[in-house]
Amino acid sequence: MDVLELYRRTGALLEGHFLLRSGMHSPFFLQSAALLQHPLYAEAVGEALGKLFKDEKVDFVIAPAIGGVVLSFVVAKALGARALFAEKDGRGGMLIRKGLTVNPGDRFLAVEDVVTTGESVRKAIRAAEARGGVLVGVGAIVDRSGGRAAFGVPFRALLALEVPHYPEEACPLCREGVPLEEV
């Protein structure tokens, strides 16, 4: 599967000057919602990501809301597991709503569309671990961390993409006066 081509085909690969959730600036942004809004593409991505973890026993898949909800669902479907999501708790962390089941000892896979620093998915992981879940792996459609994201368990992505990103003070796009778009 050519993941980058799916991003291009769906208009999900954007060029400009973007402020990422990580606080970094980048000339490129991967708008995964534009890709995942297509059920056939979403299912194909979920199947492919699920195959990377087919040998793990997974009770549930979790992702940060709202962007990861579809991804969690399609990967969980591929693995025959439950699909959960973690929401912002208003205090800088995330929580899992009542009604979404996490039993002590349940093995889980955390997924994210694009990992740059991994902070969003780490918050979802902490929420699941707080309910007794045991992390067995982290998956992403795209790893743009440059190999810097580490979770203490296997981390696998469909695509490793070297995309430049800069702290604000070192951003060449800021120096050139290119307007910044928050994403």
Swiss-Prot record:
Q: Gene3D superfamilies, alphabetically? A: 3.40.50.2020
Kindly list the positions annotated as binding 5-phospho-alpha-D-ribose 1-diphosphate: R21, K88, E112, D113, V114, V115, T116, T117, G118, E119, S120
Q: Which keywords fit this entry according to its UniProt record?
A: Glycosyltransferase, Magnesium, Pyrimidine biosynthesis, Transferase
Q: State the Gene Ontology terms under molecular function.
A: magnesium ion binding; orotate phosphoribosyltransferase activity
Catalyses which reaction? orotidine 5'-phosphate + diphosphate = orotate + 5-phospho-alpha-D-ribose 1-diphosphate
Instruction: Establish whether keyword Transmembrane helix is in the entry.
Output: no
Q: Identify the domain of life.
A: Bacteria
Q: Name one Pfam family in it.
A: Pribosyltran
As cofactor, the record names: Mg(2+)
Q: In which pathway does it act?
A: Pyrimidine metabolism; UMP biosynthesis via de novo pathway; UMP from orotate: step 1/2
- Where is orotate bound in this sequence? T116, R144
Query: Which processes are annotated in GO (biological process)?
Result: 'de novo' UMP biosynthetic process; pyrimidine nucleobase biosynthetic process
Its subunit composition reads: Homodimer.
Tell me its family: Belongs to the purine/pyrimidine phosphoribosyltransferase family. PyrE subfamily.
Q: What is this protein called?
A: Orotate phosphoribosyltransferase
